[in-house]
Amino acid sequence: ATLAPTVLIFPPAPAQLATGAVTIVCVANKYFPDGTVTWEVDGKPLTTGIETSKTPQNSDDCTYNLSSTLTLQKSNYNSHNEYTCQVAQGAGSVVQSFSRKNC
């Protein structure tokens, strides 16, 4: 069985909210190369403004650490509420999200 990755999502830092653009970061540990990362905003898939990078393979278990960064204009960020990062791997997926109004 494939191990599920550990996924964390980080909302924009308060200092960023004073600038023109904000970033949301999704980090996955124990990530296998065949996995996929998708972003949703208010339940709708998002495909722009995303930059994903992997660290070198861990020789112990053949997994990677993955970082996916979503960059948005502040006005766009403020006009939506729920931000979701989904890491799918094998038969399972891990979803992390946050609501802007709860931050």
Curated annotation (Swiss-Prot):
Disulfide bonds join 26-85. Keywords: Disulfide bond, Immunoglobulin domain. Residues 5-99 form the Ig-like domain. PANTHER family: TAPASIN. SUPFAM superfamilies: Immunoglobulin. PROSITE patterns: IG_LIKE. The keyword Nucleotide-binding does not apply. The lineage of its organism: Eukaryota, Metazoa, Chordata, Craniata, Vertebrata. This is Ig kappa-b5 chain C region.
